[in-house]
Amino acid sequence: MIVQFCRKAGIPYDVYTFTNGWDNTTSDVYDLVEANDVSLHGVQCTHVLTSQCNRRVAEQDMCNLFHQAWKLSYSYSGANYSHQLSMGGTPLNNMLFGVPAMIHDFKVNNNVQKVSFVCLTDGESAPLKYYTKHNDKVYNEMVQWGKTFLRDGSRVYSLNTTLMTQSIVKYLTDKMPTVSITNIYLTGPKGSVQYAKENLQTSHYDISDFKKNGSDTITTTDGWPLICLVNPRTFKSGTEDIEVEAGAGKSKVRAALKKFLKGKSSSKLLLASLVDQFS
């Protein structure tokens, strides 16, 4: 749906998936790493959608992505799929370190200055991994407990091992102050309470808005600047496309998106958190 909005509004976009469901790391990669480097071993990042293609190719890409999801949901389906998009763990913490390079390339390729980074997840990240070397062999270790420091050039950041994802996002907001960062977290009522408490560092979270609307937003100062908690059941029905002419003005796109989401409890959330960022 976000891609549809970007296409109608003429906003460039790139969509990536990431998993550690399979590993194609070649041995020559280890010749380039140093001890204590953040590890990308086994992390598979796949570029699945982009605005830098014509309409026919873009729609075929979305169709292929749908086939992938259908196959993963219904294993008996005869739909074609790619094992590179197979489900696995969630190496979010490690993958976040690749975001600055992605955004740099995105700015160059699309000649843009303002960028919004939206990370959609449905679970917590696996522990952060880093490389170690022993007897000229490279190993992967997981950060578990104790103090962890991240060095980026001349800057050193302290990472909280109990709130690792939040610490990494805080590092990203400092490194990329002009980039809007949002986390869309798909979860049910119970998961929304747990996730909100963890990110707000509080013992209480009022779930009434989430239950009423199927979504809620929270803001933090020491992690994700904006978190959109969304119940995936919200997207069970609705029209399949945003009805607006290509190249329409922002007001028409906003109205069309509102109509598209009419009857969906997440409409207020998405309009407030995403459209305002893109405008």
Map each language-model feature to its residues.
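Acidic, glycine-rich A-domain
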Residues: M1-S279
